[in-house]
Amino acid sequence: MNLEAYFPVLLFIIIGVGLGLALMTIGRILGPNNPDPDKLSPYECGFEAFEDARMKFDVRYYLIAILFILFDLETAFLFPWGVALRDIGWPGFFAMGVFLLEFLVGFVYIWKKGALDWE
């Protein structure tokens, strides 16, 4: 097995990691270090922090985030399918139809369960 072809990749990784570490070290050494209470306090839209950071968080935000990720992934699958539709033909068309139908059924289900109601 000829490993000489991988030498440029190894060199690229070594230079990238070395340059990154060198720049972080130079920034740490030469950068100003003047900690004070204002700089060390958490920033909350220009106001003082109201409550502890470990307060309870409404689960609906998580639900909306998960739904966003699911439909974002659906969109990510739709683009390459649209580009390759001419090559994959009717079997690919029907496979994507089943995929979209599953998402539609899931969307109707969460809609009927009230997951999208913000009351």
Curated annotation (Swiss-Prot):
Disulfide bonds: none annotated. One of its GO terms (cellular component) is NADH dehydrogenase complex. It is found in: Cell inner membrane. The keyword Transmembrane applies. The chain crosses the membrane at residues 7-27, 63-83, 88-108. GO terms for molecular function: NADH dehydrogenase (ubiquinone) activity; NADH:ubiquinone reductase (non-electrogenic) activity; quinone binding. Keywords: Cell inner membrane, Cell membrane, Membrane, NAD, Quinone, Translocase, Transmembrane, Transmembrane helix, Transport, Ubiquinone. It is a multi-pass membrane protein. This is NADH-quinone oxidoreductase subunit A. It comes from Ralstonia nicotianae (strain ATCC BAA-1114 / GMI1000) (Ralstonia solanacearum).
